[in-house]
Amino acid sequence: MKHFPSKVLTTAILATFCSGALAATSDDDVKKAATVAIVAAYNNGQEINGFKAGETIYDIGEDGTITQKDATAADVEADDFKGLGLKKVVTNLTKTVNENKQNVDAKVKAAESEIEKLTTKLADTDAALADTDAALDETTNALNKLGENITTFAEETKTNIVKIDEKLEAVADTVDKHAEAFNDIADSLDETNTKADEAVKTANEAKQTAEETKQNVDAKVKAAETAAGKAEAAAGTANTAADKAEAVAAKVTDIKADIATNKADIAKNSARIDSLDKNVANLRKETRQGLAEQAALSGLFQPYNVGRFNVTAAVGGYKSESAVAIGTGFRFTENFAAKAGVAVGTSSGSSAAYHVGVNYEW
């Protein structure tokens, strides 16, 4: 529905009031009703398209009085859709359903299979109702009341079946609405059963009256009773459809449970991955520290002169880590020497590395 600008609506309202100021009272009533209709259409447009603080809104009193005001934040908050409008709410809902649809496609296909079976049963119910209508057409004027009741029952049953089809089509939009839709179907079918019982009761009363007034009504009463039996059979078929609808709802519940289990497993895996990331980070740091310490140790010198000690120091690094090494050595002969060293990283939490070596030359 188109959203009317407030200036256009205001002009329409003033024109409606002013154009017939000198007309009769009945014309004033017509113009007032037309104005109320315009305002109602504007309000309907806001309910569909939404509104925000500062826009013009109209209130219609019980006596038809129209009040114009600027919408406040409180008016937006008090709105059923928080000012978003039915169109935006449906868009958001559709987006949410589309995001969740990939996770439940397999389960929804299973539900759709059950729905197709239910639709077949409902088609059988339609055929049974058609037979009921044909039998009711043959009822005489003495059973007109019975015929009217059964016809009403058949029409209401068809209406309920249409509602069931509409609710089943909504399964593709959101799984969460399955249970509510099927409950509505069950309520409608319960009401249908009650009306069928009332129709049978009325048929029995009409039969008794017909026997007292007309001899040939027996055969037609029997036909009417047969029609009532078919109506009860149709109601039974509808009950079977409701049972299958409940089974589909149970499957939907299983789907939700599976989704919850998957979410819990994903959460556990996420925790394990976080722990693994931490361990990898620690290993990376220790590896870099070790390489830095080895670089420092490799820079230490051994003594050259026979009978001499030496003290040596060196630094080393690898990427962001660095280390300091110190060492000492002693040359026993021209051919034989020994040395030892230790290195420590400069960052906190570093471990020490060391080496001891001998050298023999010939």
From Swiss-Prot:
Disulphide bridges, residue numbers: none
This protein's GO CC annotations: cell outer membrane; cell surface
Extent of the signal sequence: 1-23
InterPro entries per the UniProt record, alphabetical: Pilin-like, YadA_C
Cell wall biogenesis/degradation keyword on record: no
Membrane-spanning segments: 307-317, 321-332, 339-345, 351-362
Induction: Barely visible in early log phase, levels increase to a maximum in stationary phase cells (at protein level). Transcription is repressed by NadR (FarR).
Biotech use: Several alleles exist that vary in length, this is variant 1; alleles 1, 2 and 3 generate cross-bactericidal antibodies, making this protein a good candidate for a serogroup B vaccine molecule. About 50% of hypervirulent serogroup B N.meningitidis encode this protein.
Gene Ontology BP term (one): cell adhesion
Phenotype on disruption: Bacteria adhere 3-fold less well to human cells, a double unencapsulated nadA-saiD deletion is 3-fold less invasive, a triple nadA-opc-siaD deletion is about 10-fold less invasive. No change in invasion of human epithelial cell lines that express or not integrin beta-1. Bacteria clump more in the presence of human Chang cells, few clumps are associated with human HSP90.
Locations listed in the record: Cell surface; Cell outer membrane
Main location: other
Domain of life per record: Bacteria
Keywords recorded for this protein, A-Z: Cell adhesion, Cell outer membrane, Coiled coil, Membrane, Signal, Transmembrane, Transmembrane beta strand, Transport, Virulence
Function: Adheres to and induces bacterial uptake by human epithelial cells. Upon expression in engineered Y.enterocolitica confers an 11- to 15-fold increase in bacterial adherence and uptake by human epithelial cell lines; part of the uptake is mediated by integrin beta-1 (ITGB1) suggesting it may be a human receptor for NadA. A bacterial cell surface protein; antisera against this protein induce complement-mediated killing of this and other strains.
Domain remark from Swiss-Prot or TrEMBL: The signal peptide, cleaved at the inner membrane, guides the autotransporter protein to the periplasmic space. Insertion of the C-terminal translocator domain in the outer membrane forms a hydrophilic pore for the translocation of the passenger domain to the bacterial cell surface. The trimeric head domain (about residues 24-169) is highly antigenic, it sits at the end of a coiled-coil stalk (about residues 170-307).
Protein name (database record): Neisseria adhesin A
Organismal lineage: Bacteria, Pseudomonadati, Pseudomonadota, Betaproteobacteria, Neisseriales
